[in-house]
Amino acid sequence: MHSPSPHSLANLPIRRLNRGDLVPCADLCEDRGWPRDEHRWGLMLSAGTGYGIDAPDGKGLAATCLTTSYGTGLTAVGMLLVAGRYARQGIARRLMRQVMETEKGAPLALYATDQGRPLYEDLGFSPVGRAERVGGRWTPVGPSGSPSTALSTSSVTTRPASADDLQAMIRLDLTAFGADRTHLLARLPAFSDRLQVAEDQGELVGYAALWPSGPTAVVGPLVARDTAVAQALITDLAATTDRPLRIDVEHRHKELLGLLADRGLKPVSRTTVMTYGTAELPGDAARRFAPLTPATG
């Protein structure tokens, strides 16, 4: 069967996705060589808005894109995927233009792969930072066999989060992220395998979640007062799983990246953080260590 012409693809309707599209979304991820991640798709479709184009051959979805709105302050864009058999036929550009028109009024942010960056630049996005994805088996000792370097956390302790911590988490997150993520954070207890908070003399100074993605466990979001608190949260989360870890670390946090390398997490890939409608991301970058997932920020 021959592929539809670019002209016929341009006429395919763009529709809203819902939780009934979980399997087709996961199939599309698999088609592009990504983990299926139905668990993550479920969260993204409930907390955000999915856009899709049905494949003209009747086999699932030809393309997807997802937005997560944080009020008028920011909208995250992600999961721009096109089935391999429809690649390089203008679908991604058309879908992104529709999303940008629909989300008009709020600044946009996304994490771009090297493959996707030229499209985003053509559409007016500008690079504002980078993120380093690292992954691997967590080891409690360094490569020499001696205990890995650990920053002093003095009076900081971490523990599993409770429902009573949500408001303090939201306040800390608003400072770090610069936009209200309440609707996302409220879903973390059900979504995560583990949600951990850090305290210093009764004050909440950080939080992080651990959630499953295929054979790996992902750390994110990670918001912390400083690198020492971030490391304490990751260390205690790592102790709760036997899976390899994965985390997308904002590139400016070189000290944390060095500590993670010492614990066995190696570079996997890099993405470019890009924005549209704003010259920089809101919030306090010094406290923002890792996104929940690049698609949601």
Segments from the language model and where they lie:
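Conserved hydrophobic beta-strand within the GNAT/NAT acetyltransferase core sheet
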Residues: 77, 108-113, 247
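Conserved catalytic-core motifs of GNAT/GCN5-like acyltransferases
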Residues: 107-111, 126-140, 267-279
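Glycine/alanine-rich phosphate-binding loops at beta-alpha junctions
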Residues: 2, 6-55, 60-69
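Conserved N-terminal entry element of GNAT/NAT acetyltransferase domains
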Residues: 1-19, 137-163
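A structural microfeature
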Residues: 62-63, 129, 206, 269
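A short helix-loop-beta-strand connector motif used in the catalytic cores of GNAT acetyltransferases and
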Residues: 37-56, 60-63, 74-76, 107, ...
